[in-house]
Amino acid sequence: METFFLTFIGLLLFLESWKTLGFYIESRLLGYITLLGSVPLLIGLFLWEILKLEMIGYSILGIPSGTAIMLSLVLYFALWTFYFISSALTHLWSYNSRLLGFISLIIAFHSLIIFGIPWTYTEQQVTNGAAMFMSITGIVLGIISTMRFFQLAVPFRYITKMTGWFSVFGSVILLLVAQGI
């Protein structure tokens, strides 16, 4: 199930990065596409929580005592889903994007948890491969969301291009990690 979420998050970040780089002329088109891409994330989040993670698909973190790590993953993907829905509505209705910057700050703090929490378990509970995949995901998404905070909430307009390129390459890394799971 992590593959599903990381693939959609990577694709939506890839699309938003082209807007950050200035290649989209119409902001509403990005809003429609992001809203359309957020629907599977929202449905997957509800299905993942309702079906209690066993019936949907393969999970790399199949541990009996890992409720804290699973809850943190569900919260993390819920934050990203909320970010993309907020981003879609911001682009559709041409609102100010400072709110997206502050949501990115919350996601950046939670990325630190996702980066560090798998290393607190033993290797019998979480394998080194799963911990590595989660750590790569946490650090890549943490860097992207921190840069988005400094670009959107605090108006540092000089880092716009750098944020766009980090989002492009980070989303490609995220897609490769998702396919590696």
Stretch-by-stretch model annotation:
Residues 1-64, 157-161, 179-181:
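N-terminal topogenic module of multi-pass integral membrane proteins
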Residues 72-143:
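Membrane-proximal helix-loop-helix units in multi-pass membrane proteins
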Residues 1, 29, 66, 71-73, ...:
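Hydrophobic alpha-helical segments, principally membrane-spanning helices and signal/leader peptides
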Residues 50-88:
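Long amphipathic alpha-helical segments with strong coiled-coil/leucine-zipper propensity
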Residues 23-37, 92-110, 127-133, 150-170:
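Cytoplasm-facing juxtamembrane segments at the starts of transmembrane helices
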Residues 3, 9-10, 37-38, 77, ...:
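Residues within membrane-spanning alpha-helices of integral membrane proteins
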Residues 14-17, 38-57, 84-91, 108-122, ...:
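Hydrophobic alpha-helical transmembrane segments and adjacent interfacial helices
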